[in-house]
Amino acid sequence: MSICCAIRSVSYTHLDVYKRQDYTYYPEILRPSTGFPAQLPVLLSEYHFYDRKDVEDYLTLLSLIPSCFDSVLDYETNKINEGLFLSDTQADTLIADLNTFCDNSSEHYLITTFRNKVAELPDLTAEEQASYYIENEAAFREYVLPAYEALRDFLVEHKGSGSNSAGLCYFPDGSDYYAALVYDATGSSHSIDELLEMTEKQRKSDLLAINGIAASHPGISLTTDDFPMKDATPEEMLTCLSSAITKDFLPPVSTDFSVRSVDSCMQDSMAPAFYLTAPIDNISHNVIYINPRSHYEGFELFTTLAHEGFPGHLYQTTTTSASGCAPIRSILNYPGYVEGWATYVEMLSYSYAGLPEEKASLLMHNQSALLSLYATADLSIHAKGWTLSDLKDFLSDYGIDNKEAVSEIYDYIVAEPAHYLKYYIGCLEFLQLKDYAKETFGDSYSDKQFHQAVLSIGPAPFDIVKKYLRDYYRQTI
């Protein structure tokens, strides 16, 4: 059986789970960071113009946004009728974000980015460019802005219709839905209890390593003032990473990339950083966004760029494409593989930063332990019914006592179920795959071949990656 057939078989099996229970109105498309309203403006701003037809198609697309938002409102109305509407806390967050988006309409970045892209088209006259500028601004004010305002007004009107401000397990059939969601998000076949056990085991291992380093290096700390690239630009860091990774990875495919800042009107609702997946017909068009609101700089920016760039998302996307992965697979979404890979290699990047080995190891284990706390919280809030009080008790055991910060963590996990799991559980699955490869190939094992093999397989549930790992590994020899 080919890998495409195997993926199709698993996908149909997974769909059967959803068919057995009607989970139609359980998903929330208005999630604060990863939901439709937050993601759409970025996709529109990155809609690439190769010729005038692309410009005209884009303007036509804007005219369809009101009907798209009408469908969103219909869906949310049905969620209200099913007793599955979002909580007041989530509604307040979304309303604030939508207000920010709408209040920046005088010189909105969807207007300015359009102008910049049109200005770069060489076959347009100045008059034609000016005409398109006018059309776009009119379309923004006629279609885009009213759609976002209608969504905001809907949330204001229906705030209070939600019945659950805690985990998914408090909804009818919520525990079963969460289990299905976890599989969808992670690609891991392990049960909820097994995932909790895996997470705790890795956390204990990381904390043991931290204690060992601290004992053998008195006075060592988590500060990174000695990071040699603390004043480097993001582009300089990415160039450094593309060279440094070659001891563990094949050299990156020749490609272009750019680093951009999230616009001010979207900073509150966007992630600290993200890689925008390159188009399948222009795999060299790679864009990484940094959110200024996160205030990432120095070492933290370096590891973030490793996650988003080399050897993270950018490297994975371009390498998998160059390996001949069927383009049709790009329509399938396996976030556990994609984010798990980026988190796994982010941990490796600590050794590329030019810090003393013991300092790099301390920082890496500390970050891994921190991510494990979020994973345990996600699983426990949505599957075990943890309240805010339970989360406070859990995190206080690890020295996290800031009540406001803990409350924000709780609210975010409630609003974005399984979000942290695709990163952390995905990372653990890659670590388990590495252990399996070492055991299977013995003296012939190398990290470089392992990395190339899993990237050649491409995004898939982890059982499938493991099934095909032996064959793809041999092809790298």
Please annotate each region the language model reported.
Residues 1-477:
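N-terminal maturation segment of proteins
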